[in-house]
Regions:
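C-terminal intrinsically disordered, low-complexity extensions immediately downstream
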Residues: 1-84
Length: 84
């Protein structure tokens, strides 16, 4: 479970990014960067936050990250647990 500091440090775009990643089954920073028109550093921070939340797996190099959640309904439940 995350502390209040960790929750408040989540990117304001975290929930939207999580929904996109699960819907598209693509956990890449490049996908987030292009879809949300954000910079590379912010996209990478979002991916790191998604990994910490258990939504995407760890970095696998050129293969990209595995999306660990397959279902949007389950994701919404997880987001409520995180209180996003």
């Amino acid at each position: 479970m995350e502390t209040n500091n960790e929750k408040s440090s989540l990117d304001p775009m975290f929930a939207d990014a999580a929904r996109l990643v699960v819907a598209e089954q693509d956990g890449s920073a490049t996908r987030l960067q292009r879809h949300f028109e954000i910079g590379w550093n912010r996209a990478c921070r979002l991916v790191e936050q998604l990994e910490a939340a258990g939504i995407v797996g760890s970095n696998r190099g050129a293969k990209g990250r595995e999306v660990l959640i397959q279902d949007l309904a389950f994701l919404e439940q997880k987001l409520q647990e995180i209180e996003v």
